[in-house]
Regions:
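C-terminal output helix
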Residues: 108-117
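Short amphipathic alpha-helix used as the core "switch/output" element in two-component signaling
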Residues: 41, 63-76
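Conserved acidic carboxylate
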Residues: 10
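Active-site residues of response regulator receiver
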Residues: 54, 84
Length: 124
């Protein structure tokens, strides 16, 4: 059985490194994209098992990227965890309306992120 693939769409290198370090001790394969446009293209290319989507992204926002992914057959049902550092009241609902399966506010503990990933994508 091949490793399950997670696409992480995040423009901040430090945040990407934190997730890289977290997932290198798991059975998941991590693929990265650095902006919303690249994230949509990469998701359609590789068809990941789960997507971690930052909301504040260059080119197109994470919200718009999620809308585009939900409109595409190959990614319409892929779990998407929206991650944001600008958590305001109602943002979680807006993210879910845009296509997020779950929502996580920064700063978050790596344990909380891994727990959420495993909820939608068990390692076994």
């Amino acid at each position: 059985m091949s490793a399950k693939t997670i696409l992480y769409v995040e423009d901040n290198e430090m945040n990407r490194q934190i997730v890289r370090d977290l997932l290198k001790r798991t059975k998941y394969q991590l693929v990265e994209a650095h902006d919303g446009e690249a994230g949509v293209a990469k998701a359609l290319e590789i068809r990941p098992d789960l997507i971690l989507m930052d909301i504040q992204l260059p080119k197109i926002s994470g919200m718009e990227a999620m809308r585009q992914l939900r409109a595409q057959g190959p990614t319409a049902a892929t779990p998407i965890i929206a991650i944001t550092s600008f958590a305001l009241s109602g943002d979680d609902q807006k993210a879910k309306e845009a296509g997020a399966t779950a929502y996580l506010s920064k700063p978050y503990s790596p344990f909380d992120l891994l727990k959420l990933i495993r909820q939608y994508l068990p390692e076994s």
